C-alpha cells in the first residue's frame, strides 16, 4: 500500500479543509479579476507580448504578494490568540509555542499562504492564455469569457457550500467580473 508522507497528508488535509478551500476560491477570484484588469488595461498595445508580460508579471507579483499577505495576517492572528491563551493560563510569554497544536497551526498558516498565492497565480494566468493563441482583439474577448466562466463556476461552488441559490450566486460573481471589465475598459480608453 502507498504511504503518503505526513507532511503531504498535512497539505492535503489543509487543502480539503475550510481554510484551504477559502484560500483557493479567494486566490482564483483575485488572480482572474486582477489579470483581467491588466490585460484590458494593456490591450491598447499593438504587441501581444506586452500584454502577456504585463498579465503574467502582474499575476506572479500578485501571487507572491498574497503568499506574504496571507501568511503575515494569519500568523499575526495566531500570535494574538496564543498570547491571550497564555495570559488566561497564567503562563509566561512563549509557553505555548512549544505545543503540538501551535506548531500544527503555524504549518497550516504557511500552507494556506502558499495555497492563496498559487491559486492567485493560476487564476491570473488563465485570462492571459488567449493572447498566446489569438489576435489581440479576439484574445481580449476570450479572456473576458474565461474570467466570466471562472467566476460563474466559483459562484456556483460558493452557493453550494453556503446552501444558497447556486445560479444567483454565480450571477453575482459574473456581475463582479463585468464591473471590473467595464471599469478597466473605461480607464484604458481614457489613456
Swiss-Prot record:
Keywords: Cell membrane, Membrane, Transmembrane, Transmembrane helix
A GO cellular component entry from the record: membrane
Species the sequence originates in: Methanocaldococcus jannaschii (strain ATCC 43067 / DSM 2661 / JAL-1 / JCM 10045 / NBRC 100440) (Methanococcus jannaschii)
PANTHER family, per database record: FE(2+)/MN(2+) TRANSPORTER PCL1
Cystine residue pairs: none
Pfam families with a match to the protein in the record: VIT1
GO molecular function terms listed in the Swiss-Prot or TrEMBL record: iron ion transmembrane transporter activity; manganese ion transmembrane transporter activity
Keyword Hydrolase recorded: no
Membrane-traversing stretches: 24-44, 51-71, 114-134, 139-159, 167-187
Any single biological process term in GO: intracellular manganese ion homeostasis
Protein name listed in UniProt: Uncharacterized protein MJ0645
InterPro entries the UniProt entry points to: Ccc1_fam, CHP00267
Membrane topology: Multi-pass membrane protein
